[in-house]
Amino acid sequence: AACEGALLIVDAAQTAGSQPIDVQALGIDVLCFTGHKALLGPQGTGGLYVRPGLFIQPLVVGGSGVHSFDEQHPAQMPTALEAGTLNVPGLAGLCAGVEWILAQGVETLCAKETALAALFYKNIRDLPNVKIYGDPEMALHAPIISLNIGDEDSARIADILWEDYSICVRAGAHCAPLMHKALGTVEQ
């Protein structure tokens, strides 16, 4: 991207906290992530890494709470991108999640999640009516398995997996209604 004068912007919503990410080695200019997934923070948290020296013009600005009498929003990073009051309790929760992950080791957690996903896949791939989307055996694959079982409601499947097998999964649209429309899984 840099050779062509383009920025490399990475959406790490599914990987931050569960996969090692070296922004410098990968040449990432901007990395956005959610806090409530693998980083174990509360909902409503997340972050944006911006390469040092790169300035992003904010779309929305608000009071910074730091320079309350200034007529212009602060231009220095990261304050320039913080519109309004920070979610301090949420950030404290996110910080606790990140500290726990770092204490365990991202690589250790990644290996454990990958092993659990592989075990789950091995035990469901040949069951009748199981439809798996994607190829969980690919080398470069996050430990995520997208599936349906017949025409069953995904929330019911999630409940059964939790109640009968202590397997925690997420059911629903996952903010991807167009994907569900393309796959024909809107009703599930």
Where are these regions (language model features)?
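Pyridoxal 5′-phosphate
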Residues: 1-188
